[in-house]
Amino acid sequence: MGKEKTHINIVVIGHVDSGKSTTTGHLIYKLGGIDKRVIERFEKEAAEMNKRSFKYAWVLDKLKAERERGITIDIALWKFETTKYYCTVIDAPGHRDFIKNMITGTSQADCAVLIIDSTTGGFEAGISKDGQTREHALLAFTLGVKQMICCCNKMDATTPKYSKARYDEIVKEVSSYLKKVGYNPDKIHFVPISGFEGDNMIERSTNLDWYKGPTLLEALDLINEPKRPSDKPLRLPLQDVYKIGGIGTVPVGRVETGVIKPGMVVTFGPTGLTTEVKSVEMHHEALQEALPGDNVGFNVKNVAVKDLKRGYVASGSKDDPAKEAASFTSQVIIMNHPGQIGNGYAPVLDCHTSHIAVKFAELVTKIDRRSGKELEKEPKFLKNGDAGMVKMVPTKPMVVETFSQYPPLGRFAVRDMRQTVAVGVIKSVEKKDPTGAKVTKAAAKKK
């Protein structure tokens, strides 16, 4: 078998008709875990429905439809393998909740694949002021997705077909935009492809022999291997807390940083409750330690279910334990708010697993969202497209961290009127020390 390949997460972004589904479907179809029988069934259905354009989007449409109907799709269907990596495609962004998911992210993407429609009119629509290309790229960068591959898609439909001139024009324009966002275009591969015909997806295309760079598959193999933050202090935001007969209280969540293991003394923020971890389980198997990315349940002693809630964060009691945030200052980008936002605005913040109302206590500065330079001190308000530094105060106890130290606990979505109206990253946190926090006997013994 040899060493198992590294797992990486990829987020596919781009304008609505750029061909994201077709391209992703194609990769999954050719390299992925979709059972041949399933494919044959899809192909037959596609033929019956006269969908000549079946190719690959159909695969993804079927998967999505089944997923949305609540049929649990084997997640392997969203995976494919390159020579070097196991790749998982995280939430394709056609989804309403894409932005929220990308932030509270079940997983941080290691690389964004930006799909561009190269056809006449298609490219212009995607990159225009209202197009999603810009917003997605800005979001990816703000949320710390530092690597990117850019696919100039639909090269089979440019005028003339497979036009080098069109490719060059697009690379020039997209590079200048990505540079403004903060990416370094010299480090980005621009791969001319056809997700539909398959040019340069996996094999080199003779139609594009003027292009000397990597195919999409090769570009994926050139992604820098991500470093997983297991050497940082533990942060494990709770998703749920169960009471299990004969075992006791079992909090469940995903290790974001650090490790958790049996025998450890953990402190839960924001309350400061401290106790010993008896056992750690993943998929019903006991673990000696759980690492970042692992979804685990762990059993704690002498703790009632009511003492823990979703959004609490487990941490090592001696290693920078998680504490309540009295206030925090964040860089916020306003995305789709119809009016203007001033001091006193009180939306809901989705940060890691917590969902808590906060107050915009003070608009500190308005900044240029690309360069980060200050434009104005203490602005009266922020509106769509603006970025600013904002001091926020939670209305209930909550744990947040700075983005630089604990990224998954330092990025958030601002929700109001049932949509994401802003995104932000936390620059500094003023923490409160817990008063009268309970320390269980098991933990006291360990001290």
Curated annotation (Swiss-Prot):
Q: Kindly give the PANTHER family that the UniProt entry links to this protein.
A: TRANSLATION FACTOR
Q: Where is the tr-type G domain?
A: 5-230
N6,N6,N6-trimethyllysine modifications at: 79, 187, 306, 396
**Sequence similarity:** Belongs to the TRAFAC class translation factor GTPase superfamily. Classic translation factor GTPase family. EF-Tu/EF-1A subfamily.
| GO BP annotation list | translation; translational elongation
Q: Which InterPro entries does the entry mention?
A: EFTu-like_2, G_TR_CS, GTP-eEF1A_C, P-loop_NTPase, T_Tr_GTP-bd_dom, TRAFAC_GTPase_members, Transl_B-barrel_sf, Transl_elong_EF1A/Init_IF2_C
Q: Which NCBIfam families match?
A: EF-1_alpha (TIGR00483), PRK12317.1 (NF008969)
The UniProt record gives the binding positions of GTP as 14-21, 91-95, 153-156
Stretch list, region G3: 91-94
**Cell compartment(s), UniProt:** Cytoplasm
Gene symbol here is EF1A
Q: What is this protein called?
A: Elongation factor 1-alpha
**What keywords appear on the UniProt entry?**
Cytoplasm, Elongation factor, GTP-binding, Methylation, Nucleotide-binding, Phosphoprotein, Protein biosynthesis
For the region G1, what residue ranges are annotated? 14-21
Region named G4: 153-156
Annotated region (G2) at 70-74
Principal location: cytoplasm
CDD domains noted in UniProt: EF1_alpha, EF1_alpha_II, EF1_alpha_III
The PTM N6,N6-dimethyllysine maps to: 55
